[in-house]
Amino acid sequence: MYINIFLRSNTFIFLFFLYLLPSCLVSAQSSNKGIIFEGAYTLDLATNLKGGVDQGSAYLGNIDLTFTFDTEKLGFWKNGRFFVYLLNNHGNSLSDLIGDFQIVNNIEANSNSRLYEFWYEHRLKSIKFIIGQHDLNSVFAITEAGRFFINSSFGIQPDISANVLTSIFPLSGLGAIISLKINSNLQLTNAIYDGDPGTEVSNPNSLKWSLNKNDGAFFIHEFSYEIKKDSITHSTYKLGIWNHLQKQIFKGIQKQNSQGIYFIGDKKLTQLEDVDKGVEIFTQVGFSLNQYNPIKSYWGGGFVYHGIFSNRENDAGGIAIAHSRFSDYYQSQFSMDKLQSETAIEISYEFVFSNPLVLKPNVQYIINPGTNTSIPNALMALVRMSYSW
């Protein structure tokens, strides 16, 4: 079954990845000369076992290729670097089988190759600037523990991603970011992004840069506070606010601004000699301040246990829950059954066989997929295989 799905996908992309593999083995040699080449291939084999729109299988693939150029090591100016990120996605849709709103898989996208990021960063003591085509979620609204999981909501939470067009996977846009390190614990980061980077149909390769007043702009501000012990971070708390300026029409009424606020917390519960081992927990909370947005509020949280078994100290396992609550407007317009929420429960375990090779079995149970009572609760399972260098 999976073989047939794979053969219908962009097989040549996978073969091209294999062709590049030998060059990856010598990428570290370039780092001393100011150029770092890194990459990863992620393969998901997934099945919707029960419920949802339909039972069936899906194959999803993701190739990341990144290039970092250090201006000082290359013989130019100090404190600068250029970053280029090439991205390819291939396969088919898992959410089409499930019918969920939050998107169960964080690498799901249309099959295509794109220039995902291209930006310049400059550092001046406690201030850092970034300008260019940039992924908002590489800086803002990040939970380090939540990144362990596969559901999209644990990456970029849906009170942002589902409510506005902005610069996130799989399509980034132009942006400018300034980050100020106030002290060793507190940091303030501000940014402005293109208010409409396009869609996977209108801008499939992320090469169409268009800035005009009709696109509006996306502003985001985030305070980040770290609690450290012996120079090691044990807790991080983030408070963010965003404002999307773009004219939208609802029920014949023109609305321009869309705002939201969020909080994220990461904390290590166990204080072991090896700081990479033990239990860490995370929480995400977000609210939309615009009554016309689809998502009114979001809550997510969970835990990850690193080094559960003494004979597999690099493995990790965890459980997480993502709960999105829909606005009255969305329910009145799009939810015939007036369901108020969708919830995803995820269980994941990661086998680390070597530094670059990881195998991650994953199970998710989706309650009220797409807020539609005609779609039964869904149970899906997948295995993620990833190789990085």
Q: What spans do the regions from the language model cover?
A:
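Outer-membrane beta-barrel "beta-signal"
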Residues: 377-389
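Residue-level signature of outer-membrane beta-barrel architecture
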Residues: 30, 43, 69-75, 121-124, ...
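Outer membrane beta-barrel
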Residues: 56, 60-195, 293-297, 302, ...
